[in-house]
Amino acid sequence: MAIEYREWLEGDDLTLLEVWGGPETEQARQFRGALAVSSAGTDGTPWRRCIVAEDVIDGVGIPVAAGVVYEASLHPERLWSYIEVARDHRRAGIGATLLTMLRREAEQAPSGVTKLRAKVQPGTAGAAFAEAFGLAPIQRSRLVVVEPGALKLPVFPAKNDGGGPANDENAGSDVVMDLATGSVELTDVVGRYYTSIHGWDSPGVLSVGQVQKLFLDDLTGAHGALVLRVEPGSAFGAAVSPSKKGRIRAFAVSYAEAALDPAADASAQGAKATDVFVGHEPALDSDDAAAAVRDLLSLLAYQHPVMLELDDSMAALRAAVEPLLESGKARQAGADTLVVSD
């Protein structure tokens, strides 16, 4: 076979889709969209270099593989990279050549960043390729569905209702609250939490606008938030209602219903799970953070299943969810995702 390499051209995506067929992994589904015309990064679009490999037959080049490397404003310390080669052209050095060319292009990135990262699924050709070329895992991520009633509901203290006898009617009403996704208080804790769990790949300094756009804007599908607060106190004793709300201990942002895996057994999937992003105030100690997340998760999954992303860096969420996975009260949806890097 005679392989030639060139810049990505408009229309290559349609040709390659015919050659590649459907995506083999969720990572392929996600990153195929990053294959696009190269950009110098000067017109408001990220810097990008995209290269196509053609199999030349009788003087006609047929695209069979492509690779891309590009900058991102979020997590700017590494460049994202993606390579895909047609099944019948693998193990012929095409992927290795594309990676070498992309590394050379990365040296010209305006940011000066040259480290690469990619997402792979363990046990796949992509994971084996990454390992062979020195890209090692720096994070593991799983999608987990927590079944209804998996966690015991928290018990909140009875409340003094307007100076009358304590009763259970409003127990927890000053601790568990709905919050608008546009809330500045919510935006602040979400941004700081996201930064705290990404010490392995810093997101950089996140502005209020960036946090809103990433997690809380209507375009993300966010349609509600629930927070668990610190029990408020009153300077005038228990008989007087406190004038200020307690600070946020944990939060959950809910999104549009997650799509079910078409390859999974319908009876096993059951009711549709609500997609949620669960986190906590980063300043909490590990035990308090785990307790806060566990209590909030028990409320979220009281009657309906919820789906959440569980990264290995999310210590408090792991403390709540991993025992549920072991006991069968939660299940993993799909395969692990590994972020690999130089």
Where are these regions (language model features)?
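Hydrophobic alpha-helical segments and helix pairs
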Residues: 1-4, 117-171
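Short amphipathic alpha-helix that is part of the acyltransferase structural core
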Residues: 1-39, 54, 155-206
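Active-site rim helix/loop that mediates acceptor-substrate recognition in acyltransferases
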Residues: 11-68, 201-240
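A conserved beta-turn-beta hairpin within the catalytic core of GNAT-like acetyltransferases
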Residues: 63, 71-83, 90, 247-248, ...
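Conserved acetyl-CoA-binding loop-helix of GNAT-fold acetyltransferases
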Residues: 85, 91-107, 132, 283-302
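Conserved active-site alpha-helix within GNAT-family acetyltransferase domains
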Residues: 96, 104, 108-114, 118-141, ...
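C-terminal "cap" of GNAT-fold acetyltransferases
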Residues: 145-181, 318-342
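C-terminal structured domain segments
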Residues: 268-326
